[in-house]
A protein has these predicted regions:
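Active-site-proximal or metal-binding-adjacent scaffold patches in catalytic folds
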Residues: 1-90, 100-121
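Walker B catalytic acidic pair
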Residues: 96
Length: 121
C-alpha cells in the first residue's frame, strides 16, 4: 500500500438541513481534491472535512484534534443562500491544515501558511 494515499481528507459532510446542501458538498469535495497534493507533501490527514455555521460571524474555520475534524464556514453569517467566495474558503482550509503542524498562531505557523499560499493561492 502506498502510504501517501493515507494523506488526504477521508470523509466530507455538508450540512444537509441548509439550502443548497448539494452545492456545499461539491465545494467541500473540490477543496479536498485541490489540497490533496499539499496534504501528501506534508503528510497531513483529515478524518472529516465538514461544513459548519458557528454563531461567531468572524469564525471561518476550526481544526479539531490536529486534523480529526476540520470545519469550514461556507456561507455568509445569517445568510444561508449566500456562499463565501471559493478562494476565501480555500485559504481558510490552508490555514486550518497548517494547524496540523503548528497548533498556536505563532511565527512558525504564519511562515508555513504564507509559504503554502504562495504556491496554491
Amino acid at each position: 500500500m502506498d502510504l501517501g494515499d493515507l494523506n488526504k481528507v477521508w470523509e466530507i459532510k455538508a450540512l444537509k438541513k441548509k439550502p443548497a446542501s448539494d452545492e456545499a458538498q461539491k465545494t467541500l469535495e473540490k477543496i479536498a481534491k485541490q489540497v490533496q497534493p499539499i496534504m501528501k507533501k506534508h503528510r497531513w490527514r483529515v478524518k472529516v472535512l465538514s461544513e459548519f455555521c458557528p454563531n461567531n460571524p468572524a469564525l471561518l474555520g476550526l481544526n479539531v484534534g490536529g486534523g480529526v475534524n476540520v470545519k469550514l464556514r461556507l456561507r455568509k453569517a445569517n445568510r444561508d443562500q449566500d456562499f463565501i467566495p471559493y478562494n476565501q474558503v480555500l485559504d481558510t482550509m490552508l490555514h486550518e491544515l497548517c494547524h496540523n503542524a503548528h497548533g498556536p498562531h505563532n511565527a512558525s505557523f504564519y511562515k508555513l501558511w504564507d509559504d503554502i499560499r504562495k504556491v496554491y493561492i
